[in-house]
A protein has these predicted regions:
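Long, C-terminal-biased catalytic regions of enzyme "large/alpha" subunits
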Residues: 1-256
C-alpha cells in the first residue's frame, strides 16, 4: 500500500526551535511516521534521522487512560533507549548519533484504534468515533508534552531546544507507525490507526497459515448463538464482510 507524505504540511508542523534553526524535513522513512531533519544543519554538521518508537495499545485504553504515570513511564523508556544508542553506537553511526544527541526525537504512537471502537460498538468514521478520536489523542498529547517538560527539568533539555531557551527533552514526541507486526503480537489488535481489513482472513507466516477471526465480532456472534464455523466460513467467503448476516443490527453491521 502507498504511504503519502505532504511535505509542506510536515514542515509547517515541525518544532518551533527547529524552525528557528532553519531546519527542514526533506523526506520521511518508508512508512512515513519519521519526519526529521536530514542533511547539513545550521551548524554545518550532517544529520541522519533516528527512529526511536513505541506504540500504546488503544485496545486497552480504558486500563491506562487515567493513569498519570503511564505515558510518562513510556517516554522515560524511550529517553533511556535514546541515551543508550548515543552512548553505544559505533563511530560509523556518527551522523545518526549527532542527530539523536541534538534532537532526542522519539515517536510515541498507537495501535488498536479500530479495535477500541469495535469493543465500544462505535462505527469507524461515525460522529462518535470522531469525538473519541479527538479525546484519545488529546489525552495522549497532553501527557506526552508534560513528560517532555518533566524530563527536561530532571535531565536537561535537548541541545536543539536549549539553544533557543525552550524546555523540551524531546524535539519530536509522537509518531503513528503502521504496527502491522507488533499489533499481531499484542493479541490481534487493529494496526496503527487503520481500520481492520477483514473480520476473517488467512494470515500467512513462516510458521504456516492461520485463520484470524475478529475477537469482538466473535462476542457479538456468541450473543446471537451464531459463533459457528459455518457463519465464519460465510464471512471469509464474503471477503471478511458481515453485510450478509441478517441477524445483525444496522449499527453492528456498520461497526464490523
Amino acid at each position: 500500500e502507498p504511504y503519502i507524505v505532504y511535505i509542506d504540511t510536515v514542515n509547517r508542523q515541525i518544532p518551533q526551535h527547529h524552525k528557528l534553526a532553519g531546519l527542514k524535513v526533506k523526506t520521511s522513512n518508508l512508512c512515513s511516521e519519521i519526519t526529521l531533519p536530514t542533511g547539513v544543519d545550521n551548524e554545518g554538521n550532517q544529520r541522519t534521522a533516528v527512529c526511536c518508537l513505541s506504540s500504546l495499545n488503544l485496545d486497552t485504553y480504558d486500563q491506562w487512560k487515567d493513569d498519570p504515570q503511564f505515558v510518562e513511564d513510556v517516554m522515560r523508556f524511550l529517553d533511556n533507549v535514546m541515551t543508550d544508542f548515543i552512548n553505544r553506537a559505533p563511530d560509523e553511526f556518527a551522523h545518526a548519533k549527532y542527530s539523536a544527541m541534538r534532537e532526542r526525537s522519539v515517536g510515541l504512537g498507537v495501535m488498536g484504534l479500530h479495535s477500541y471502537f469495535q469493543q465500544k460498538n462505535i462505527p469507524f468514521g461515525s460522529v462518535m468515533s470522531k469525538v473519541w478520536n479527538k479525546k484519545i489523542f488529546q489525552n495522549i498529547q497532553e501527557k506526552v508534552d508534560e513528560a517532555s517538560k518533566t524530563l527536561a527539568d530532571e535531565r536537561g533539555s535537548c541541545p536543539d531546544a536549549a539553544e533557543y531557551g525552550m524546555k523540551e527533552r524531546f524535539s519530536n514526541k509522537t509518531a503513528i507507525a503502521p504496527t502491522a507486526s507488533i499489533s499481531i503480537i499484542c493479541g490481534g489488535s487493529s494496526p496503527g490507526i487503520e481500520p481492520i481489513a477483514a473480520n476473517s482472513y488467512t494470515h500467512k507466516t513462516l510458521s504456516g497459515s492461520f485463520n484470524v477471526r475478529n475477537k469482538y465480532l466473535k462476542k457479538i456472534l456468541q450473543k446471537y448463538n451464531k459463533d459457528t464455523d459455518e457463519v465464519w466460513s460465510g464471512i471469509t467467503t464474503n471477503q471478511g464482510s458481515v453485510s450478509h448476516l441478517n441477524f445483525l443490527t444496522a449499527n453492528e453491521k456498520d461497526t464490523f
